[in-house]
């Protein structure tokens, strides 16, 4: 990656898998108006117990949003990115989006600005985005064929009128491509989000991937459809299922030769706060933040200095571990899938019983690569575990050889072992990549001894 691009993404948790171990994002819900209807969307406001795009607990004015961002920046030194992702469309509800960015950057000039849009209104604001120093934009692109699009979007609102069917999807497609081209031409990094909808666009997403790569998209994030009936979406109410983990992985792997894939997405709420995989939004509702917070940059500056040192230390440790692995293991050695429990920082630093997700890595003699994450209910409740919860954790770890944890009790360790999953706390609080490589060398050495 060239230095200019790395400078843009190194602190952005969504645009860099490495950065998401260290840095947090914050979404503010200032843009409720939307100009399209998606069959997978129902923008429920006032809902604090769901974790999916478009959901918020409270809608904010730009002034309230700025107040909240300053309060979070003072309490969450990891904060590096302010994003506007709805609950409607940030480019359509443009005046609120623009005013929010203006108010926040007047107080916190170094915060990265990011927005997410369906793309329909984006071409109208390209030059303003440059003027505002927005250098990350996400466009949701689910199709490049209007016939496919008509199955996803019932209507759009464009040029002061509602348009339906294939014609609506044709206009949406043209505007999305114009937005993508215009953003790339202006040096703004574009992440494309695509929702994988089995039987509708699953095969088509390979074409989408090729096209957005050809036009210069920086990342392509293929996400599973969320379609539980209780969410009240058209797809949920009509029985359209989401993809299985295997189906999602198959499409991602089929697209691996196209645009760079983002695999660490958590499908955040439109008011999410914190590291990816956690949401501290309920700690910062309006009734809990000060009326007139004053921004103090000291904690964020100190944290960035610490992260810089940690990154160098982690990089050196990973390089040494990789060299040892290449020396000890044949290039043809088989791959392993290894899960880890982490609270961030790129370390194995979470108790097994507290984990609500597992980060899964693929390792072989050539190195360690992030593969995907698996969510689950945490095993420990009120200080103890439950058998049904362990069963769900085991299901989430299907296909995983080993899980590396900071700590684990005897009961869950034995339960995992009975399911063919080894739990290890030998590398508690170590960096993830060197620990996985150490495990890999150990396994390959054992295998060589058995076959010798």
Swiss-Prot record:
CDD domains the UniProt entry points to: NifB (cd00852), Radical_SAM (cd01335)
Metabolic or biological pathway: Cofactor biosynthesis; Fe-Mo cofactor biosynthesis
GO molecular function ontology, one term from the record: lyase activity
Enzyme class, broadest EC rank: lyase
Residues engaged in binding [4Fe-4S] cluster 1: 34, 38, 41
Binding site for S-adenosyl-L-methionine: 40, 88, 140
GO biological process, any: nitrogen fixation
Annotated [4Fe-4S] cluster 2 binding sites: 265, 268
UniProtKB keywords: 4Fe-4S, Iron, Iron-sulfur, Lyase, Metal-binding, Nitrogen fixation, S-adenosyl-L-methionine
Note describing how the cofactor binds: Binds 3 [4Fe-4S] clusters per monomer. One cluster is coordinated with 3 cysteines and an exchangeable S-adenosyl-L-methionine. The two others probably act as substrate.
Role of this protein: Involved in the biosynthesis of the iron-molybdenum cofactor (FeMo-co or M-cluster) found in the dinitrogenase enzyme of the nitrogenase complex in nitrogen-fixing microorganisms. NifB catalyzes the crucial step of radical SAM-dependent carbide insertion that occurs concomitant with the insertion of a 9th sulfur and the rearrangement/coupling of two [4Fe-4S] clusters into a [8Fe-9S-C] cluster, the precursor to the M-cluster.
Protein name as it appears in the record: FeMo cofactor biosynthesis protein NifB
């Amino acid at each position: 990656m060239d230095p200019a691009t790395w400078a843009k993404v190194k602190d952005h948790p969504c645009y860099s898998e490495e950065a998401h171990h260290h840095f947090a994002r914050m979404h503010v819900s200032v843009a409720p108006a939307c100009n399209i209807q998606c069959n997978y969307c129902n923008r429920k406001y006032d809902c604090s117990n769901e974790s999916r795009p478009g959901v918020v607990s409270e809608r904010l004015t730009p002034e309230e949003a700025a107040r909240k961002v300053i309060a979070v920046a003072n309490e969450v030194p990891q904060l590096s990115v302010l994003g506007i992702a709805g609950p409607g469309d940030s480019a359509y509800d443009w005046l609120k989006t623009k005013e929010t960015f203006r108010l926040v950057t007047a107080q916190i000039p170094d915060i990265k600005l990011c927005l997410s849009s369906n793309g329909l209104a984006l071409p109208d604001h390209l030059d303003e985005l440059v003027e505002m120093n927005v250098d990350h934009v996400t466009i949701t692109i689910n199709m490049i064929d209007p016939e496919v699009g008509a199955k996803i979007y019932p209507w759009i609102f464009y040029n002061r009128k509602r348009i339906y069917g294939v014609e609506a999807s044709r206009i949406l497609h043209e505007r999305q491509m114009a937005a993508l081209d215009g953003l790339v031409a202006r040096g703004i990094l574009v992440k494309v989000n695509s929702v994988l909808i089995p039987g509708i666009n699953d095969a088509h997403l390979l074409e989408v991937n090729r096209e957005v790569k050809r036009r210069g998209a920086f990342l392509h994030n293929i996400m599973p459809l969320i379609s539980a009936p209780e969410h009240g979406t058209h797809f949920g109410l009509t029985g359209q299922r989401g993809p299985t983990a295997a189906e999602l992985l198959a499409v991602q792997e089929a697209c691996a030769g196209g645009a760079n894939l983002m695999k660490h997405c958590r499908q955040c709420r439109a008011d999410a706060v914190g590291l990816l995989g956690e949401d501290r939004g309920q700690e910062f509702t309006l009734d809990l933040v000060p009326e007139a917070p004053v921004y103090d940059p000291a904690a964020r500056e100190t944290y960035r200095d610490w992260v810089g040192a940690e990154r160098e230390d982690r990089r050196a440790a990973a390089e040494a571990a990789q060299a040892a692995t290449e020396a000890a293991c044949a290039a043809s050695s088989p791959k392993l899938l290894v899960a880890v429990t982490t609270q961030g920082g790129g370390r194995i630093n979470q108790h097994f019983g507290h984990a609500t997700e597992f980060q899964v890595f693929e390792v072989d003699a050539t190195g360690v690569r992030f593969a995907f994450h698996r969510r689950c209910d945490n095993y420990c409740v009120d200080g103890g575990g439950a058998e049904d919860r362990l069963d769900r954790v085991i299901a989430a770890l299907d296909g995983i050889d080993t899980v590396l944890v900071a700590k684990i009790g005897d009961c869950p360790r034995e339960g995992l072992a009975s399911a063919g999953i080894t739990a290890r706390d030998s590398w508690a609080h170590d960096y993830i990549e060197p620990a996985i490589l150490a495990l890999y060398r150990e396994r390959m050495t054992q295998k060589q001894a058995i076959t010798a």
